[in-house]
């Protein structure tokens, strides 16, 4: 005849053995989340300086903005005598658009003007030339948006900034 006291001791011993066996797994460090490269403020400043140098060299003052990969602004610069007052709104929006769509904003302008006019209904995006993704290796880490006096100038200034980290 088995006593309830013996059963109780057996269950306690089994519970102790199970917890000791599982303890190392419970205490193991959690798996590391892979870190994505991110733009620092210093890198955003480097990008803006390169874009500003191009704008000054060519005589095309404007607004230059750098956003992170989420489209959030890191740094915006309004140069003296910026050609378009609305540039303070347009440049950050172009950077946001290029960051979130992961492509140049010119691609979206071309789509709206071509086979995808419905894209113009995408609220909160600026589908105009002058926004370019910024890459570290093959990873898009942000974008630059520029609003100067012409779309060609916007793109040239943005390209100078986007290439600053290479």
Where are these regions (language model features)?
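Bacterial N-terminal signal peptides that target proteins for export
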Residues: 2-14, 21
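Intrinsic low-complexity, intrinsically disordered segments enriched in polar/basic residues
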Residues: 1, 7-8, 26-32
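Flexible, solvent-exposed loop/hinge segments and secondary-structure transition points
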Residues: 28-166
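C-terminal segment of classical bacterial N-terminal signal peptides
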Residues: 17-27
């Amino acid at each position: 005849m088995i006593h309830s006291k013996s059963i109780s001791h057996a269950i306690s011993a089994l519970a102790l053995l199970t917890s000791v066996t599982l303890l190392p797994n419970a205490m193991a460090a959690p798996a590391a989340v892979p870190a994505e490269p991110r733009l620092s403020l210093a890198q955003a400043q480097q990008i803006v300086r390169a874009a500003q140098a191009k704008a000054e060299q060519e005589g095309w003052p404007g607004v230059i903005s750098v956003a992170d990969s989420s489209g959030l602004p890191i740094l915006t610069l309004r140069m003296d005598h910026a050609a378009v007052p609305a540039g303070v709104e347009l440049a950050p929006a172009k950077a946001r658009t290029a960051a979130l769509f992961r492509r140049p904003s010119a691609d979206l302008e071309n789509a709206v003007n071509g086979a995808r006019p419905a894209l113009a209904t995408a609220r909160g995006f600026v589908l105009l030339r002058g926004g370019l993704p910024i890459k570290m290796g093959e990873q898009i880490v942000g974008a630059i948006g520029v609003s100067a006096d012409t779309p060609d100038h916007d793109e040239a200034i943005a390209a100078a900034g986007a290439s600053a980290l290479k």
